[in-house]
């Protein structure tokens, strides 16, 4: 038997959950499908940088993690070997902050708290995606059962193409080295972005620390990770 939903969202991470809740606020029904257990995101410590506009959207769906978010009030941008720098200040744009840094788990938790019990099919394996003239049919395995779901709109929001041959992948030959450091003195809510030939280096204020994201070619990233 084939089930029918208006919108099917593959991926129940922050992007998928935000879309689901925004659609619900507008009176649209959708279903989330995710290959991971629903609690898998609760331990993810990665830092996410969000714009002020993202905060406004999350506030509209009652999912802004106020206490967990660190505001970015200034951003210092420069290029290695280049002259000068750009300094962006929230006051120039009459904003409370240019953006915010929040841990993945805190944002995911705030969003998940607003989901209905039947909003997500967790630990689901996508078996096949078949497009039709005015719909898409998704075959999957969930809780040991085979299910067929027909939808008018299919959204990929899981960050990976999975086994879908219709999703193209571009290899940029870059890896991100991520760590956290404690600055002395404190970061004063300033973010830094430095462009280099190998890739950008970003320092994002998170609590009392900086979350460091250094984008490098794979071989150089491995060399950095091998350092003591």
Language-model features, listed with the residues they occupy:
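Beta1/beta-strand and adjacent pyrophosphate-binding region of the FAD-binding site
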Residues: 2-13
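Conserved N-terminal helical subregion
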Residues: 3, 70-176
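Hydrophobic anchor at the start of a short beta-strand
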Residues: 7, 28-30, 154
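Glycine-rich, N-terminal phosphate-binding loop of Rossmann-like dinucleotide-binding domains
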Residues: 12, 38, 158-159
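N-terminal Rossmann-fold NAD(P) dinucleotide-binding loop
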Residues: 16-17
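Glycine-rich FAD pyrophosphate-binding loop
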Residues: 22-46
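N-terminal FAD cofactor-binding segment of flavoenzymes
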Residues: 44-80
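Conserved FAD-binding catalytic core of PHBH/FMO-like flavoproteins
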Residues: 147-148, 153-228
């Amino acid at each position: 038997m084939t089930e029918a939903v208006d919108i099917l969202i593959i991926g129940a991470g922050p992007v998928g959950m935000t879309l689901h809740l925004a659609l619900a606020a507008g009176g649209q029904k959708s279903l989330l499908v995710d290959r991971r257990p629903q609690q898998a995101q609760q331990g993810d410590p990665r830092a996410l940088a969000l714009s002020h506009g993202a905060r406004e959207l999350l506030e509209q769906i009652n999912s802004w993690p106020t206490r967990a978010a660190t505001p970015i009030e200034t951003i210092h941008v420069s290029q290695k070997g280049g002259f000068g720098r750009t300094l962006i200040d929230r006051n120039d744009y009459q904003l409370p902050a240019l953006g915010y840094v929040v841990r993945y788990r805190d944002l995911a938790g705030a969003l998940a708290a607003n989901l209905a019990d039947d909003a997500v099919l967790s630990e689901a394996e996508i078996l096949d995606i078949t497009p039709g003239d005015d719909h898409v049919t998704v075959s999957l395995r969930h809780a040991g059962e085979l299910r067929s779901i027909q939808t008018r709109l299919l959204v990929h929001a899981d960050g990976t193409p999975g086994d879908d041959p219709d999703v193209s992948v571009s290899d940029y030959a870059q890896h991100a080295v991520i760590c956290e450091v404690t600055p002395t003195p404190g970061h004063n809510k300033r973010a830094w972005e430095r462009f280099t030939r190998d890739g950008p280096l970003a320092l994002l204020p998170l609590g009392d620390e900086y979350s460091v994201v250094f984008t490098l070619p794979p071989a150089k990233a491995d060399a950095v990770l091998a350092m003591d």
